[in-house]
């Protein structure tokens, strides 16, 4: 008996590959935050190669998750609203970062997430934030979560995290 071939145009489970690149719309501020976070990563390791934005975000997300666990263990919580509330110039002062260029605006920036794991982790983090009602929103957009993760990472790195 001959093996049956699937109909032309059908998709088999072996032909489905995970998405490995995803463009996410963010504020232009995110581009600047990534450069600051990359500088912090390079300064804290002996690797002199410039990390990719996706690598920086993955490291920042890992750091933020550890920070959240530590806060839970201490029966505390992170003050997400105070991390996101200030404008960029005020945030830079709070996080002890150099002043951001004045040319930065709320104009768009496309952040390309690379890697199926990072894409899945960012979307899972969005869901977690929404489930915990962190911002009293039914849905947290990936661009907002990326900005939050980078801000938390940069504030924690200099011991300036609001309680």
Residue ranges and their predicted role:
Residues 44-78, 134-163:
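Short, basic amphipathic alpha-helical segments that act as recognition/interaction helices
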Residues 12, 20, 27-29, 44-47, ...:
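Serine/threonine-rich low-complexity intrinsically disordered regions
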Residues 122-126, 130, 147, 151:
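Mixed-charge, glycine-accented linear interaction segment located at domain edges/termini
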Residues 2-41, 84-126:
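Short Lys/Arg-rich basic patches
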């Amino acid at each position: 008996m001959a093996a049956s071939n699937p109909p032309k145009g059908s998709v088999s489970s072996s032909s489905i590959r995970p998405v490995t690149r995803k463009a996410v719309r963010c504020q232009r501020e995110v581009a600047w935050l990534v450069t600051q976070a990359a500088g912090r990563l390079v300064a804290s390791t002996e690797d002199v190669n410039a990390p990719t934005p996706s690598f920086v975000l993955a490291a920042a997300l890992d750091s933020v998750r550890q920070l959240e666990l530590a806060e839970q263990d201490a029966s505390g919580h992170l003050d997400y609203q105070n991390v996101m509330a200030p404008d960029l110039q005020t945030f830079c002062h709070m996080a002890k970062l150099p002043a951001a260029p004045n040319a930065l605006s709320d104009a768009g920036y496309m952040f390309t997430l690379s890697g199926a794991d990072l894409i899945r982790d960012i979307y899972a983090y969005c869901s977690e934030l929404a489930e915990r009602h962190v911002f009293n929103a039914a849905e947290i957009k990936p661009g907002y979560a990326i900005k939050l993760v980078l801000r938390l990472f940069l504030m924690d790195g200099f011991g300036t995290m609001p309680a």
